[in-house]
């Protein structure tokens, strides 16, 4: 049997895996157990009551968190003409067309989000095998293929998170940093859950938000009592 690290022993002593914690208690636990030498992210896992094998029950989208994610997001935009100018004014870090595509092909991808205007997809479409596996391929479902590139850039910079269930029907995303206040983490989590409720597939039956757990980058998951959250859309 693998030997438990001191950190894992402390987590096992502190976190009762059989219970759901009131949100402020859950956040206090995360902060207490976050002992890494860097500011850890606060991540969330949401178990959805969907059948992920059925395409009409998959959940995918994006929402802007009220307090952002605590990360400085670099945005690349494929656009030309007026759209390119609008993207630059909105704060895009890199804007281009064929020249930007060449950078991507060389592996020069110093950005976290890619946005494209619809007319630029003829160029972006050739980059699917590079951008796709990295989760960077623009998609209209999450608002990154849009005629309003300026708004997409502002959303990304403001702390928009993109979500998509995995094959087990679980959503994984980041909702902040461990140095956020408990109220900021709570409000970000609530905003995400409201967005997920709105994205509920019509064919999904029974309980939808089955389990919500929060964790830090290096920590264990703490289940949250949804009754202590305000998720009325």
Curated annotation (Swiss-Prot):
Entries under Pfam families matching the protein: Ribosomal_L1
Swiss-Prot/TrEMBL keywords: Repressor, Ribonucleoprotein, Ribosomal protein, RNA-binding, rRNA-binding, Translation regulation, tRNA-binding
SUPFAM superfamilies registered for this protein in UniProt: Ribosomal protein L1 (SSF56808)
One GO-annotated biological process of the protein: translation
InterPro entries: Ribosom_uL1_bac-type (IPR005878), Ribosomal_uL1 (IPR002143), Ribosomal_uL1-like (IPR023674), Ribosomal_uL1/biogenesis (IPR028364), Ribosomal_uL1_3-a/b-sand (IPR016095), Ribosomal_uL1_CS (IPR023673)
Entry's Gene Ontology cellular component terms: cytosolic large ribosomal subunit
Organism domain of life: Bacteria
GO MF annotation, one: structural constituent of ribosome
Signal sequence residues: none
Complex formation: Part of the 50S ribosomal subunit.
Matches recorded under PANTHER family: 54S RIBOSOMAL PROTEIN L1, MITOCHONDRIAL, LARGE RIBOSOMAL SUBUNIT PROTEIN UL1M
Protein family (similarity comment): Belongs to the universal ribosomal protein uL1 family.
HAMAP family documented for this protein: Ribosomal_uL1_B
Free-text function comment from the UniProt entry: Binds directly to 23S rRNA. The L1 stalk is quite mobile in the ribosome, and is involved in E site tRNA release. Protein L1 is also a translational repressor protein, it controls the translation of the L11 operon by binding to its mRNA.
Protein name in the entry: Large ribosomal subunit protein uL1
């Amino acid at each position: 049997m693998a030997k438990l690290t001191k950190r894992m022993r402390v987590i096992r002593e502190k976190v009762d895996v059989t219970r759901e914690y009131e949100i402020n208690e859950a956040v206090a636990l995360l902060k207490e157990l976050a002992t890494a030498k860097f500011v850890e992210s606060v991540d969330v896992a949401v178990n959805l009551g969907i059948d992920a094998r059925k395409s009409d029950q998959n959940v995918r989208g994006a929402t802007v968190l009220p307090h952002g994610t605590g990360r400085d997001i670099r945005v690349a935009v494929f656009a030309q003409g007026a759209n390119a100018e609008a993207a630059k004014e909105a704060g895009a870090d890199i804007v281009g067309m064929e020249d930007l595509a060449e950078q991507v092909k060389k592996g020069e991808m110093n950005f976290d989000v890619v946005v494209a205007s619809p007319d630029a997809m003829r160029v972006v479409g050739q980059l699917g095998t590079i951008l796709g596996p990295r989760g960077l391929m623009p998609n209209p479902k999450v608002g990154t293929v849009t005629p309003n590139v300026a708004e997409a850039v502002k959303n990304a910079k403001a702390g928009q998170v993109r979500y998509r269930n995995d094959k087990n029907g679980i959503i994984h995303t980041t909702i902040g940093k461990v140095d956020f206040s408990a109220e900021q983490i709570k409000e970000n989590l609530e905003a995400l859950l409201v967005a997920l409720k709105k994205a509920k597939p019509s064919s999904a039956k029974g309980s939808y938000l089955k389990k919500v757990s929060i964790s830090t980058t290096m920590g264990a998951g703490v289940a949250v009592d949804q009754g202590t959250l305000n998720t009325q859309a």
